[in-house]
Amino acid sequence: MTRGAWRCIIGWLICIGGTPVASVAQAPETAVVMLGTGTPNADPDRSGPAVAVVRAGRSYLVDAGPGVMRRASAAAALHADSSLQPRNLRILFLTHLHSDHTVGLPDLILSAWTLERDVPLEVYGPPGTQAMVDHLLAAYAADIRNRIDGLEPANPTGYQVRVHEIAPGKVFEDGNVTVTAFAVPHGDWEVAFGYRFQSADRSIVVSGDTRASDAVVRACDGCDLLVHEVYSAERFQTRPPAWQAYHAKAHTSTTELADIARRAAPKQLLLYHQLFWGTTDEGLIAETRAAGYKGPMRSAADLTRY
């Protein structure tokens, strides 16, 4: 790649608010890498929802949307972060079981194994997670047996999954980060979660899919970074009535997010899972500003680091 091309890539990362690899040394020890910022819409520039919290050589994933493995590999190279290499993807937290947040799960189970992960994948999620994993392993049973019993030098443990079906409260602690799950309202799902990650140097909250909720305000409460989903309030009226009814119950508008963020008071607000409907990153930020939020705010793109 030419020097000019690299300058273009670094300039693009700076413009959308992320951190290029040259600046990683100045970043906090605990960082967020946006592996996927998309929605069910087939946007070629945005993979499905997947957020990585990285610290001290370990990675912790929130959701596994389509494309998660390839985005993680790309991020590992771009940010010189070995914790995002396939064999080191070992811990996953699922917010809920919608397909756009879980289609990458079999990839995370099986591809990371074939690329030398030799420990079981730890998956934390709502009730139903165990059944999903059981069905996935059954679906790929022939593949697994072929790799283990055939000529391929596959290890016997890396495809295994340890599922932890969780309830709100502290769900994980390893001396590096502490993870707390909190319930959020998302459409017709009986159980959906957001997550708060607390480390020695930073507090990070990932909303997951949710309509405007005081639970996010309580979980953040002045956190360092709030990663929150959003849709365009201005473009909402262009949607068919049935979709308007759904989105109003399942997601958070720019107008609503302005109020949530004002009360949650994060040091930085990061938009993701953006439903643009014809607007832009700048448009979403402008809508949120117009609704009264004045704090630091960015709109995330895939592969950016914060």
Predicted regions and their residues:
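N-terminal secretory signal peptides that target proteins for export/translocation
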Residues: 1-5
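Bacterial N-terminal signal peptides
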Residues: 7-20
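Binuclear metal-dependent hydrolase catalytic cores
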Residues: 25-205, 216, 283-306
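Cap/insert and terminal regions of metallo-dependent hydrolase folds
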Residues: 194, 201-203, 211-304
